[in-house]
């Protein structure tokens, strides 16, 4: 029994040095899962995969450093565009629509500040949730690799 306990403790410690559990507390989910296994050692970014990252430039909605889970919709070298109808495309492929959080705001202000296009730089990733209500790169712009905490795997 003592050796089994030692093995269990060792495995637990090894698990905690690589993984942690993340829970999305939002009422309206922006991803398909609420609970995630986060591999904090895996920061190799792949398009379409989900990652936990520390947000920047999202104030006053979220303080800098708040962790979020979103999927990678755009990689370095990809062309991101948000048109006047608020369609969001990456390399010409539609990946989302709208600015749900800006409803009721002055439409001129929204179009001036939230439309346009850009080529993602060497260390820039366009992160998006799966819901139009997701607060993501549409609002705070690209995420850099230094902000990424680990790859997220949906559990349930």
Name each region found by the language model:
Residues 43, 73, 96-106:
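A short, sequence-level motif marking secondary-structure junctions
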Residues 41, 56, 85, 93, ...:
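Short, surface-exposed secondary-structure boundary micro-motifs
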Residues 63-97:
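Mid-length scaffold segments of soluble, non-membrane domains
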Residues 43, 58-59, 80, 88, ...:
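Solvent-exposed loop/turn segments at secondary-structure junctions
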Residues 24, 98, 104-152:
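Acidic/glycine-rich C-terminal interaction modules and beta/coil loop segments
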Residues 46, 75, 83, 120-122, ...:
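Residue-level recognition of short, solvent-exposed, well-ordered loop/turn junctions
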Residues 1-67, 117-119, 138-156:
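Protein maturation boundaries and topogenic segments
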